[in-house]
Regions:
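TRNA-recognition modules of translation machinery and tRNA-sensing kinases, especially anticodon-binding
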Residues: 1-421
């Protein structure tokens, strides 16, 4: 139906927007303290960007992208994630030109064709950061801490942080061979997707939700046994930095990310009560992505957090902010002359920083008082024929059930001072 939003999308109505803006305020405040600048990229990109960046053969590229041809027969895709877009912007706009570390953050909609359920929508929102140009393990730790601080700044508790290293091009082939040797015996019992992954990307077998409970999965080789000395040292230093910062974590040698570009550090923060959708943030290092997209070799690390899941976690812990009242002041005008006199007062109040509302339909006193109550306004200003003749207005304190008369000449000044107390 034309009056229904497409499946997997959702309207965010005024009574819910306050929670979103609260989360976004925390994000912007935190990123300012960490020194990250906001970037806004297009919602669609050339399809090849994601094919090369995320990787052919990944579930995202093969099954989940919204891809279409425009009128110029160019293949375009609604962004399924934003790291590839951020790297493209980094290259196109020569953000690397000063040779320094670039620290970026974003908030925006992403799109994946998936089975809609709580915490998993076809249009969903992410907050993420990308730090490009530095390979220090301290930067990995900073990014992990930023993700963790974001969630705890919202008041969330009961979070788990899992950590792993997925190696580098020097040591990952060894692990790939060990995985293929191990899973060869179980190949007939793997799901169809994992049978395909066995040849193309056996690491992603470890990320399979369907085969996760198979008893043989627990015996799969751990990548930590295959890391080269450089990756081992890097991973140990990341852990040392996190320990020094007082953040608890759990090593998970089978934690891999579902995108091909990750190298070395991989992490995931979960809120277990959300069940199957418990992962609220995750990321890692992607030292080869900039080069893969046409740039010079550039180390980089980042993460993304799913805001729908974050809001679900906040709701479960009763941490959603209270909806503020719609108005501070409600003007009640009785009669046409009073309505004409009230309108410029309404504008003056708003210009003075007061949230002010007024009924334009000429309803009765009783009906307008009901509107004032529904708006949550602390004060109702009543202007009728008698008040207009005396050049005054009645100011009713809705909380104290008290009222006083105020001269119109001083009304705006009085209300501004009362509201700002």
């Amino acid at each position: 139906m034309l009056t229904n939003a497409p499946r997997g999308t959702k309207d965010i109505l005024p009574d819910a927007v306050g929670a979103w803006t609260h989360v976004e305020h925390v994000i912007r405040d935190l990123c300012a303290r960490y020194g990250y600048g906001e970037i806004r990229t297009p919602m669609f990109e050339h399809t090849e960007l994601f094919q090369r960046g995320i990787g052919d053969g990944t579930d995202v590229v093969d099954k989940e992208m919204y891809t279409f041809s425009d009128r110029g027969d160019r293949s375009l895709t609604l962004r399924p994630e934003n790291t590839a877009s951020a790297v493209r912007a980094y290259l196109q706009n020569k953000l690397y030109a000063d040779g320094g570390l670039q620290k970026l953050f974003y908030i925006g909609s992403m799109f994946r064709y998936d089975r809609p359920q709580a915490g998993r929508m076809r249009e969903f929102h992410q907050f993420g950061v990308e730090a490009l140009g530095e390979e220090s393990p301290a930067l990995d730790a900073e990014v992990i801490l930023l993700a963790y601080d974001f969630l705890t700044a919202l008041g969330l508790t009961g979070l788990t942080l899992k950590l792993n290293s997925v190696g580098c091009p020097a040591c990952r082939p060894v692990y790939r061979e060990r995985l293929q040797a191990y899973f060869k015996e179980y190949l007939p019992t793997l799901c169809d997707d994992c049978k395909d992954r066995y040849t193309r990307s056996p690491l992603r077998i470890l990320d399979c939700k369907r085969d996760a409970e198979q008893p043989f999965m627990a015996g799969a080789p751990a990548i930590t046994d295959c890391l080269c000395p450089a990756c081992t040292e890097h991973f140990e230093q990341v852990q040392q930095h996190l320990t020094a910062a007082g953040v608890s974590y759990e090593l998970d040698p089978r934690l891999v990310r579902g995108l091909d570009y990750y190298t070395r550090t991989a992490f995931e923060i979960a809120y277990p009560p959300l069940g199957a959708q418990s992962a609220v943030a995750g990321g890692g290092r992607y030292d080869g992505l900039v080069e893969e997209l046409g740039g010079n070799p550039t180390p980089a690390v980042g993460f993304a957090a799913g805001l729908e899941r974050v809001l679900l976690a906040l709701e479960q812990q009763n941490l959603l902010p209270a909806q503020p009242p719609a108005a501070d002041v409600f003007l009640i005008a009785l009669g046409d002359a009073a309505a004409k006199a009230a309108f410029p007062l309404l504008h003056e109040l708003r210009c003075g920083g007061v949230r002010a509302l007024m009924d334009y339909a000429g309803r009765s006193m009783k009906a307008q008082m009901k509107q004032a109550n529904r708006s949550g306004a602390r004060y109702a200003i009543i202007l009728g024929e008698d008040e207009l003749a005396a050049h005054t207005a009645l100011v009713r304190d809705m909380a104290e059930s008290a009222q006083e008369t105020c001269a119109l000449d001083y009304l705006v000044e009085k209300m501004i001072s009362e509201v700002k107390v």
